[in-house]
Structure formats: C-alpha cells, structure tokens
Amino acid sequence: MVKTTGTICDLVTTSFQKSLLEDCFDNLKDKNNRLRFNNFAYSIRELSRHFLDTLAPERDVVLCLWFLDESGKGMVTRRQKIKYAITGGLSDNEIDDLIGLETLSKVTKEVLDSIDLLNKFTHINQSTYNISDSEIDKNSTLVIKAFENFANRIIECRESIIEKLESKISREIVEKAMWEISDKIDILATHHNIEEINIRNYNVLCISSNKILIKVLGELEVRLQWGSDKDLSYGDGCELYEDFPFSSVLSFTINEDWEKTKIMVEDYKVDTDKWYK
C-alpha cells in the first residue's frame, strides 16, 4: 500500500490541505470500496486545485495589470492562476528580464501537463475501476509524482524569480528607503540622530498583484542625547552612541523602473531590549 511521502507532506501548507491529504490516503485503505483508487485520484486532483487557489486567489489575479478577461465573464483561467502563483503581478517585460518568457511558458506547460494527468485518473473506466493492489500502487505513485511535479515546478520557478529580483533591487535602493523613513524612529532619549544605517540583509517576502514586500534586517548607529544642546555645553546633559538592531518590511510598488518605484513602510521595529539589561 502506498503511504504518504515526506515530499508531498512538505508541500501542503494549510491545515485544510494537510487534513485533505490525510483523507486522500485513507481512501486507499478502504479495500471494500472498488472506487478507492478513483476517490484517491479525485481527492489529490482537488488538493492540487486548493493548492493553486492558495497561491493565486482569484481576487488577486484580476488586479494584475496583465490580466485579461479571456472568458468574457471575469473568470480566471488555470493558466493565469499558474502565472500569478509564479510571478505575481510582474509585467511580461519584467518576467522576460528575470527568467525569460520562454522559461515561464515551459514551466506553465509542465504544470498543466501534471494537472491533465491528475484529471485522467479521476475518470472511471475499466482500466482504473476495481483494479488490483499492484495496479493501485503503481497508479497511486504516478498520481503522487504528478502532484509533486505540479507543486515543485511552481515553487522552483517562483524561487528563481525571487532570487533574481533580490539581485535587481540594489542595496543602495533599500538603504535609501531606510534613510527616508528614519525620522519615524523614536528611541529612548530626548533627542537622537541616526548616524548610520547598516543593512545586514534583505529578502523578498512575497510578490502580490501590485507590490513586492521586502524584509530588511540591520543595525542603526544612533546618537542619543538627554537635555538640550545648551545643557550639554554646560555639562548638564548627556550623550551616548549606541547601535540597535532593526527589522522592517518595505513595500515596493511594482514598476519596471526601480529607481522611480514608490516605496512604503509596512512595518518598522527597533530592538532596544539590550538598553534595559
């Protein structure tokens, strides 16, 4: 009997998907049901649908500038969902620059082929109905591999785009954005100045229909001042230099010209815990 594999279990993310996957394999255990393989194949096919819906909600796909209502009814096609799951709202020009449109087309075809294979096994006919245990093992393995290929090709291609996108968004752009929002920081003292912003690393969190979220980690070099400048001149004030780690989430509006893209602050936290130790 085929059992759940580590790979397919690692691919599903939500509690619903995990429960559905468990029930998919429970179908195969019911030897009194002559439709047990068909039910298994159908359930895995539905799991692939939910997996894709999680990565590409229709409400987000329709907001992309590249979205076209091919059905005339506002319906999102499977091909469009796959594109969004991989590229978000990036334009075709941007995609071509990052990985090439031919690569996207090839991956999309591979994903669609995997879905077609899953669909094939959901049809009830003599070759799939009430089949032997050995046939169930063989066909179930094909179904599992089809799902794994479907999910992995989407994930791998998306990761490739993110990696190239991180290279394209320069450290200078991120650092400039952090300086522009540095006046939002309120740290400990009566007065303070940000002397230096050191970006340790940054990575793309997600690509949505109209923006890219980037997590930034680093340290702030800060001059802390208690009292006025006049107090300091009389020796009544105090100033110290400290560095504090920070984390921030920046939102880059999707734009082919990264030098002109609009940058917003989604989140900004400065860790001052060491000050109190």
Predicted regions and their residues:
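Charged alpha-helical initiation segments
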Residues: M1-N38
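Amphipathic, well-ordered alpha-helical segments in soluble domains
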Residues: F16-D23, S43, H50, E110, ...
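Short, hydrophobic, well-ordered secondary-structure elements
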Residues: F25, R36-R59
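Short, solvent-exposed secondary-structure capping/transition elements
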Residues: L52-C64, S127-S132, N152-S160, G227-D231
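Alpha-helical interaction scaffolds
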Residues: E70-D97
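Short, mixed-charge amphipathic alpha-helical segments
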Residues: T87-S114, Y202-I207
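Charge-enriched, short contiguous segments at helix-coil
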Residues: T103-I154
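Cystatin/cathelin-like cysteine-protease inhibitor module
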Residues: L142-K277
